[in-house]
């Protein structure tokens, strides 16, 4: 499975690299879990609705969510910081 980041999600990921190594480890763990099974596993995966229909979310912690989509067996990470404001 190919893993790609949007420009915004890459900036989020880099922010965690510089500011919160513990949550960075959690994000990496979630990415590995998504690669194994995109719709089941840790982080309470849930399909998003309304304008985010087609995207999925997993909990990083109570403040942050990993938002992603799967296309042709490839993972595209939309955001990994905060909830769904963007």
Curated annotation (Swiss-Prot):
Family: Belongs to the YoeB family.
Active site as annotated: 46, 83
SUPFAM superfamilies assigned: RelE-like (SSF143011)
Alphabetical GO biological process terms: RNA catabolic process
UniProt keyword terms in alphabetical order: Endonuclease, Hydrolase, Nuclease, RNA-binding, Toxin-antitoxin system
PANTHER family, per database record: TOXIN YOEB
First and last residue of the signal peptide: none
Highest taxon, organism lineage: Bacteria
Gene3D superfamilies for this protein: RelE-like
EC number(s) recorded for this UniProt protein: 3.1.-.-
UniProt function note: Toxic component of a type II toxin-antitoxin (TA) system. Has RNase activity and preferentially cleaves at the 3'-end of purine ribonucleotides.
Gene Ontology molecular-function annotations: endonuclease activity; RNA binding
Subunit structure as annotated in this protein's UniProt entry: Forms a complex with YefM which inhibits its toxin activity.
Protein name from the UniProt record: Toxin YoeB
InterPro entries: RelE/ParE_toxin_dom_sf, YoeB_toxin
Disulfide bonds: none
């Amino acid at each position: 499975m190919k893993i790609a980041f949007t420009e915004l999600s890459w900036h989020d990921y880099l922010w965690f690299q510089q500011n919160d190594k513990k949550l960075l480890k959690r994000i990496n763990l979630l990415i590995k879990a998504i690669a194994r099974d995109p719709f089941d596993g840790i982080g309470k995966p849930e399909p998003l609705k309304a304008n985010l229909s087609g995207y999925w979310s997993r909990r990083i912690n109570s403040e942050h969510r990993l938002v992603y989509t799967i296309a042709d067996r490839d993972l595209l990470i939309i955001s990994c910081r905060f909830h769904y404001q963007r």
